[in-house]
Amino acid sequence: MTTPEDIIRRDVLAMTGYPVPDATGFVKLDAMENPYSLPAPLAAELGERLAHVALNRYPAPRPAALIDRLRAVTGVPAACDVLLGNGSDEIISMLAMACAKPGAKVLAPVPGFVMYELSAKFAQLEFVGVPLRADLTLDIDAMLAALAEHRPALVYLAYPNNPTGTLYPDEDVERIIAAAAASLVVIDEAYQPFAQRSWLPRAAQFDNVVVMRTMSKLGLAGIRLGYLVGLPAWLVQFDKVRPPYNVNVLTQAAAEFLLERVDVLDAQAAQLRDARTALAHAIGALPGATVFPSAGNFLLVRVPDAAAVFDVLLTERVLIKNVSKMHPLLANCVRVTVGSPEENARLLAALKLALP
């Protein structure tokens, strides 16, 4: 009898699935989501729009109205094209699949977004992680040396980085782009609404750069929409490995509707930026807590015992992310999402119990 072990790749058999904990009944501060719902009148209007979507028809593979709205809202350069994905995770997988030549490598600073490494492994690419400095800033000399040694196919730069919140200096990014002449540099701007800095306006200035974004952190995590901006020479190739109906009709309709009213989402992002400052100050005042600078909608905090803090918060029904085992540089670190005022108050009350 044939078994999975007879058919499935050995490296896949050795993997574990990406863990997503059940957050029912918890204050959910583990996944960098926008805590705010849409205003009731806007939600009702969205419901009316979605009620008229033709669910019996396949989605348009390249929905022109949505792409045009993305161009207008984000300022996509005229020379660039836009490729849509079912979240940026799918785009990362598409890039790995398209670039998976024998011996090809993917390079990124670490600790960083885990999907860069996972997608490389899925496509049987070698992943090269370049450690940050001890203070979690970019080690530009190590990056340049790694680029020269490995000549990777793909270089990922999260701008800002997750889970550290670090926003790499523009001059360092420019040096990496220049040194990566044999590579494609993917600048991941998932947290751009909170960083308020972007390489997207300059995407057409480099022949080896694409910029990736997602609607998730802006407040639309549930609809799963990511997009890639870059010169057509690149995007036409990546489009070949895109599943033909990858972005569903409800996502397309919801995204187009909300991009027409993006001021609501922008106002929520502004609230979270202000809350981030206040929350960082409050956590930093707790005994034994060190808060790292963050340009995202989350904070990385070093505590005396990350596992103990996580467990106390779990008891208090507050769910955060214990990242201490992700990388040695993250020893005794936890990551907390910036939530609503009520959620942040619950978080602080629980942290005071965990850090007496």
Curated annotation (Swiss-Prot):
GO terms for molecular function: histidinol-phosphate transaminase activity; pyridoxal phosphate binding. It is an enzyme of class 2 (transferase). Pfam families: Aminotran_1_2 (PF00155). Keywords: Amino-acid biosynthesis, Aminotransferase, Histidine biosynthesis, Pyridoxal phosphate, Transferase. It comes from the Bacteria. It catalyses: L-histidinol phosphate + 2-oxoglutarate = 3-(imidazol-4-yl)-2-oxopropyl phosphate + L-glutamate. SUPFAM superfamilies: PLP-dependent transferases. The modification N6-(pyridoxal phosphate)lysine is found at K217. The keyword Amino-acid biosynthesis applies. GO terms for biological process: L-histidine biosynthetic process. Pathway: Amino-acid biosynthesis; L-histidine biosynthesis; L-histidine from 5-phospho-alpha-D-ribose 1-diphosphate: step 7/9. Its cofactor is pyridoxal 5'-phosphate. Its EC number is 2.6.1.9. PANTHER family: HISTIDINOL-PHOSPHATE AMINOTRANSFERASE, HISTIDINOL-PHOSPHATE AMINOTRANSFERASE 2. HAMAP family: HisC_aminotrans_2. Belongs to the class-II pyridoxal-phosphate-dependent aminotransferase family. Histidinol-phosphate aminotransferase subfamily. Homodimer. This is Histidinol-phosphate aminotransferase 1.
